[in-house]
């Protein structure tokens, strides 16, 4: 006889879905943690050397496709089946990684358009993947185990992310497969590896049966699209989406802007020297040689975000299992704001890691709860649809945040541009030029490309790379770029507090 008081267990399909998610995230973060460097870092020899504004535009369109397409694909996953949707998405994701690897070499196509086109193919695949796997997962969970279930899912996501943070060092620094370190060939191998990891999910999809969504299987595509649009027009749902959009605008800058900020400004030399006890092979994977001396790469520093979540998110989910989801999210928002400011206001790698800890604690409380909240308030037969809405705040936030970050960082934060600005404003050579104050015209005005900016500044000033970096830090204070993002996060927290108070009066939104 079944004990009616027994807690529902997490079954085999639940764990298979989590493994599929882990491989997808490992492949994704193998690319994502290095994409900011590949796109615009002036001192990386194998990168594309695009501008911060170009990067912002690419990230904005990436976010639009990856996060807004699930508005449609969530309903399609409910209609046509989660497993079929995931299979289509995996093939598209593999194609996206291969396009990133090889389209750079297509004659007559600029680096900007080749990367943008390839990344949109990848984004399309991801947009089909998310509603499929999250819809399948939601049907494996009940109200009694949803907090722990979503916490485990978030834990698995970060296992993939954590491993994905270290793989680039093997391909880029150690130069696997005979490619010189940080060369175009090494970057290509990195992207091919992501395609290979993604292909493993094709095998895993054969190991379980599809989960019935509960939605109509005879409904036409037009009706699915109409239902998708009419459901999202609910004013209270739109208010929640707007609040979370502001929060994700702030959050994503740790992953999208912080890599460039670390590469430009953070001094991880003391941390690198403290790792001298590591075996030579491992040390070579977590320490890179830079003009400023041995440093810990930004992808390794930011891996602490995934590491902290791996060791803490399941416990955090257990601690908050009886907490109202909106209340837990509010606390998490406040912690993330503090962490962002601590991580962004320093040149010390040790203090940055402390900020990442605060940021990660906030993410542990907010990230899983956003999915749990929408799954709990979703009407029957609409879990895939509502979980497709999870991505909308990310899309809006990353779209606006990418545009803002590109504009702000190009003018106030990028070291190569600030080096050119210093040459224009404070050196005899620069004072003979007629610069109009527009950062975009600095290269043409001075006749110095961004890739040579720091070398020329050192030549004019007589300073070494460390001293030249400090000169720019104290002259232009690039850490102020984090203030607008923190301010937007504070607005989101205040709005969520008000929404949470009002939701107590709505039985269908109070979760």
Locate the predicted segments by residue:
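Hydrophobic core of transmembrane alpha-helices in multi-pass small-molecule transporters
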Residues: 22, 96, 110-129, 350-366
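Central cavity-lining transmembrane alpha-helices of secondary-active solute carriers
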Residues: 56-75, 162, 303-316, 396
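C-terminal ends and interior cores of transmembrane alpha-helices
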Residues: 91-109, 334-347
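Intracellular juxtamembrane helix-capping segments at the cytosolic ends
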Residues: 128-142, 364-379
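Short amphipathic helix-loop junctions that connect adjacent transmembrane helices
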Residues: 33-54, 256-297
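Glycine-rich segments within core transmembrane alpha-helices of 12-TM secondary carriers
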Residues: 147-176, 194-198, 390-405, 409
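Intracellular loop-helix junctions on the cytosolic face of multi-pass helical membrane proteins
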Residues: 1-13, 142-147, 162-163, 168-269, ...
């Amino acid at each position: 006889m079944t004990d009616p008081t027994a807690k529902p267990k997490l079954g085999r399909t639940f764990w298979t879905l989590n493994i599929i998610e882990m491989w997808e995230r490992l492949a994704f973060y193998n690319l994502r943690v290095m994409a900011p460097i590949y796109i615009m870092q002036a001192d990386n020899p194998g990168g594309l050397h695009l501008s911060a504004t170009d990067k912002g535009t690419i990230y904005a369109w990436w976010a639009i496709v990856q996060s807004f397409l699930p508005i449609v694909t969530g309903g399609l996953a409910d209609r046509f089946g989660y497993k079929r949707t995931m299979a289509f998405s995996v093939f598209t994701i593999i194609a996206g990684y291969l396009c990133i690897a090889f389209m750079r070499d297509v004659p007559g196509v600029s680096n900007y358009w080749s990367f943008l086109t390839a990344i949109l193919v990848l984004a399309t695949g991801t947009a089909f993947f998310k509603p499929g796997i999250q819809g399948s997962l939601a049907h494996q969970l009940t109200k009694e185990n949803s907090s722990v279930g979503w916490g485990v899912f978030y834990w698995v996501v970060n296992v993939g992310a954590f491993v994905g943070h270290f793989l680039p060092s093997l391909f880029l620094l150690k130069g696997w497969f005979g490619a010189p370190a940080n060369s175009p060939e090494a970057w290509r191998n990195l992207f091919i590896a992501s395609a290979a990891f993604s292909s493993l999910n094709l095998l895993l999809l054969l190991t379980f049966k599809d989960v019935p969504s509960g939605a109509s299987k005879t409904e036409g595509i037009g009706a699915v699209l109409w239902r998708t649009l009419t459901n999202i027009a609910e004013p209270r749902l739109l208010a929640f989406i707007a609040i979370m959009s502001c929060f994700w605008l702030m959050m994503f800058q740790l992953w999208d802007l912080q890599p460039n900020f670390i590469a430009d400004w953070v001094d991880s030399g003391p941390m690198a020297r403290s790792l001298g006890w590591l075996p030579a092979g491992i040390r070579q994977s977590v320490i890179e040689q830079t003009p400023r001396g041995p440093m810990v790469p930004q992808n390794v520093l930011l891996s602490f975000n995934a590491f902290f979540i791996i060791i803490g998110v399941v416990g955090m989910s257990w601690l908050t299992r009886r907490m109202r989801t909106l209340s837990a999210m509010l606390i998490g928002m406040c912690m993330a704001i503090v962490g962002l400011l601590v991580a962004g206001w320093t040149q010390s790698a040790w203090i940055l890691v402390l900020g990442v800890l605060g940021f990660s604690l906030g993410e542990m409380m907010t990230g899983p709860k956003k999915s749990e909240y929408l799954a709990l308030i979703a009407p029957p037969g609409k879990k895939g649809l509502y979980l497709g809405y999870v991505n909308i705040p990310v899309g809006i936030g990353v779209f606006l945040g990418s545009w803002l970050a590109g504009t702000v960082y190009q003018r106030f934060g990028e070291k190569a541009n600030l080096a050119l600005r210093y040459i224009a404003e404070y050196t005899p050579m620069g004072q003979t030029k007629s610069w109009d104050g527009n950062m975009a015209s600095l290269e043409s005005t001075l006749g110095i490309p961004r890739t040579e900016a720091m070398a020329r500044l050192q030549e004019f000033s007589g300073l070494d790379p460390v001293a030249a970096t400090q000169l720019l830090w104290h002259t232009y204070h690039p850490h102020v770029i984090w203030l607008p993002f923190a301010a937007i996060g504070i607005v989101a927290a205040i709005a969520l507090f008000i929404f949470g108070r009002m939701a107590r009066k709505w039985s269908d939104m109070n979760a």
